[in-house]
From Swiss-Prot:
PANTHER family: FLAGELLAR L-RING PROTEIN. The basal body constitutes a major portion of the flagellar organelle and consists of four rings (L,P,S, and M) mounted on a central rod. Residues 1-25 form the signal peptide. GO terms for molecular function: cytoskeletal motor activity. The keyword Nucleus does not apply. This is Flagellar L-ring protein. It comes from Burkholderia ambifaria (strain MC40-6). A lipid is attached at residue 26 (N-palmitoyl cysteine).
Length: 229
């Protein structure tokens, strides 16, 4: 007896493939870092020496004798003292109340006078609404990270970015920082506080079993997106 193998039709296969792709998309959580620029930069090649053996060296690495070592070129490093403490509180409320009363008599025809001669009508209505809301947040982040100058703006400000990775047991911790630094705010110890950095972006994230345990399952996220409540 010849066996006949039944295969699903092309539309059925397409629907199944689409469903699998949708579930796979639900299984993935967007984890794009907020800092998209490069985390480091290489300094350009120094200029060739025009007078070998002279005291003055026009190369990139040359620094004047009495000049400090603060960063000012691409590839220089700077220490960021992260000291962020942000507190926010918000509260709101609304209360409305409206009432109304109406009394009136209804004139009736002569042949209905015996039934509705003294008919009076009244109406009353009330509308009341009360709502309150509140939110609060407190964030504290302290630490240090050394970053690299990735660009020098025409006004002399430094675009910096850097990354620090720490592997602790089964988790990989990431600290990323980027921003624009005014060279005048850099201290003699070659450091600056994060509160003095413009356009600062600070990111602290992790990868590992602990982070996965804190993440909602893909099937639960799928039904959460479909639930109407």
């Amino acid at each position: 007896m010849k066996q006949v193998r039944l295969l699903p039709s092309a539309p059925v296969r397409a629907v199944c493939a689409l469903a699998v792709a949708a579930l796979a998309g639900c299984a993935q959580i967007p984890r794009d870092p907020i800092i998209q620029q490069p985390m480091t930069a290489q300094p350009p090649m120094p200029m060739s020496m025009q007078a070998p053996g002279s005291i003055y060296n026009p190369g990139y690495a040359g620094r004047p004798l009495f000049e400090d070592q603060r960063p000012r070129n691409v590839g220089d490093i700077l220490t960021i003292m992260i000291a962020e403490n942000i507190n926010a509180t918000k509260s709101s409320g609304a209360n409305t109340n409206r009432q109304g009363n109406t009394d009136f008599s209804v004139p009736t025809a002569g042949f209905l006078g015996g039934l509705f001669a003294k008919a009076n009508m009244s109406a009353a209505g009330a509308n009341k609404f009360a709502a309150t809301g509140g939110a609060s947040a407190a964030n504290t982040f302290n630490g240090t990270i050394t970053v690299t100058v990735t660009n020098v703006l025409p006004n002399g400000n430094l675009v910096v970015s850097g990354e620090k990775q720490m592997l602790i047991n089964q988790g990989n911790e990431f600290v990323r920082f980027s921003g624009v630094v005014n060279p005048n705010t850099i201290s003699g110890a070659n450091s600056v506080y994060s509160t003095q950095v413009a356009d600062a972006k600070i990111e602290y994230s992790s990868k590992g079993y602990i982070n996965e345990a804190e993440t909602m399952g893909w099937l639960q996220r799928f039904f959460l997106n479909l639930a109407p409540w």
